[in-house]
Each structure stands twice: as C-alpha cells, then as structure tokens.
Amino acid sequence: MKIPASRRARLPLVLVIALLAWASMAPAAHAAPVQVLGTGVALEPPPGFVPAQRFTGFERDVKSASIVVTELEGPAPKMQKGMTREMLASRGMTLIRSQTVRVHGKSALLLQVSQVAAGTEFLKWMLVAGDTKKTVMIVGTFPKAANDLALPIKQAILSATWGGKVQAAPYEGLLFRADPTPVLKLAGRVGNALIFSESGSMTHGDPNQAILVMGNSSSAFSIANVEQFARDRATRSTQVGELRNIVGRALTVDGLPGYEIVAEANDARTGREVRMYQLVLVEQKTYYLAQGFVPADRARVILDQFRQVTGTFKRLRAPK
C-alpha cells in the first residue's frame, strides 16, 4: 500500500507510481463481465483468474499474475500526461511503448512496461482512462516467461466498463473496516485502502489539514517481529524525510498484535515540519498499515483523532 504525500492531489500520483502496467488494442475477452468489488468497474477476467482476496481485482496465484483495478479522484488527461518514460525510469521501469486507444467508448492511454522484481522479469500492462473528474487505472502484471497470459490479460483490460449507476459501498470487499470521527471523515477509498481527511475529500481542501490512510497488504507476507517490521516500514515512507524523535509502543487492536509509531519529520516536498503516525497490525501472513500526516503545530489534537479511527479497526473476514 502507498501513503499519500500531501493533503491534496498527490494521492493519485503515488498510486500511479505503484500501479503501472500496459495494454494494447485487442479483441474482447471470453468470460462474462464481472463487477470488481469495491469499485464501479466491471471487466471480463481471463480463464483461471478469480476475485482477489487482498486487493480490488483478480489474481491467478499459480502464475504470479494479477489484474488490479483502482479508481482515483482527479482528471484522467492529467494522469495520462504524467506517464512519461522518465517518470517510469525513475521507478525502475522500462517503457516499451505507449498508445492511445478507445475503451468503453472513451479515449484511454495504454502503456507497456517491463520491470525486474526479486530476480524475475515481469511485464506490466496498464490502462489509464476516465474523464475530467475521475481516473480509472487497470493494471495487468505477469512474468515475462508466462507468455501464454499476455493476450488474455490484454483482452480483459480492454473489456473494462465503468461509470454506470453502480456505487460501491465503502467497505465492500475489504478485509477490514475503520470508522470516521467528527473531525476525520471518510473521504473515500482507493483500492484496498480507506482515506480519512478533515475536509471529507481526497483531492481538495486546506493542505494544512490532516490525512490518514489505512489498508492491508496486497499479498501474503510473513512477519516474525512486528516492532522491527513497523520501524523499518516507517523509514521507507517517501512522503517525509528522515524520522526524528521516534516514539513507539506495542498494542493490541481487534485481538491482533501491533506496533504504533509517532515521529517528527519534514515533508519531502515542502520541507514543512510534520508529525507522522503509523500503526501496523499483523494477522498471520497479512498485515494492516495505517499512516497519518499532520502539520507539527496541530499534532497534539490530531494524533488523538488518528488513534480514535485506528481504534475502531475491525476485521470483516479472514484473508485466504
């Protein structure tokens, strides 16, 4: 899961970096359209793909392949313009090609990207579509060696439809829920993450306001030492610089072992002093991560609000 860099429109950019893939023009897929839980998107999954347990989309574990669907507030044309060769290269990805196509009767950008992860070369296909208010991103990933999946995944991505009357419930398909407070409202959802903000919006409002994001890991992941993992995870945030005066404590929420961290830092983009809040909860091979950011001069009040939200965390179903 990626955590937003600021209180404004940086959330979509962070998710773009995390969810890059490609697609190209192809015939329709073979399965019947399936609504992706937690989204307003439907597509025809390839044979052998099933609804994912930890993210919004479909997966085929035996092939290490997935299709991830994400909806973002913000204009699609702006998002498409940012998908440059240089931006991809800065994230360790190689742009193979890109093209403009029409999907669901609308113009969309298709990118083909390759990336090496854990010694394996993957191909990522990404569709970036939508309108002036919302962006739809559909990412297909598969090992380069599994070439038999190339066409089926491409077909599935290009079969996507969206923008109908179907409105997903905030917690639909999630492994958990967490409740808002009068101060921190539920602004929305991005994939398997809930976004809380003071304004109740993900892309608008006062940049001085606080934001909290909570989600779960998108794949199975064993954690032997919760504190060690939490401290390491906090230092990997790209939203702030070096952490200072780190204060941590072990705690239990909904019966799960966890570790909470509060630290001083400076915003990576503006240099402004902020407070970072983080909570990690572990359930077997799934972990839940909450990260919040607030200007330092408002930390005393808002840190309590972060804790009120995370204190309502409750599992809705067991991950498989």
Language-model-detected regions and their locations in the chain:
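Bacterial N-terminal signal peptides that target proteins for export
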Residues: 2-15
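Signature of long, low-cysteine stretches enriched in small and polar/charged residues
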Residues: 33, 86-131, 230-282
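Secretory pathway targeting signatures of secreted, lumenal, and periplasmic proteins
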Residues: 35-82, 114, 120, 177-235, ...
